[in-house]
Amino acid sequence: MRDPVSSQYSSFLFWRMPIPELDLSELEGLGLSDTATYKIKDSSVGKMIGQATAADQEKNPEGDGLLEYSTFNFWRAPIASIHSFELDLL
């Protein structure tokens, strides 16, 4: 008899909603039309797999503005400023 706990129908991956395909026209409406910095793995799946090469990044030296607001940079504690006279006290 089948174990109901390990059944494929009880898994999260079976019951979750599929990720919708990315519509590039919606990105243009938001002002994020610079999609050349990403390579599309498979157009039928619509997954982004990585950033552009170094030659493409030289063309755009300011980089992607959204990378500044990643979850790591946004939620980390600010670096404490230590002055030279405080270092002398240590």
From Swiss-Prot:
It comes from the Eukaryota. It holds the Pfam family WRNPLPNID. GO terms for biological process: extrinsic apoptotic signaling pathway; intrinsic apoptotic signaling pathway; positive regulation of apoptotic process; positive regulation of DNA-templated transcription; positive regulation of mitochondrial depolarization; positive regulation of release of cytochrome c from mitochondria. Ubiquitinated, leading to degradation. A motif (Nuclear export signal) lies at residues 24-32. The keyword Phosphoprotein applies. It is found in: Nucleus; Cytoplasm; Cytoplasm, Cytoskeleton, Microtubule organizing center, Centrosome. Belongs to the MLLT11 family. This is Protein AF1q. It comes from Pongo abelii.
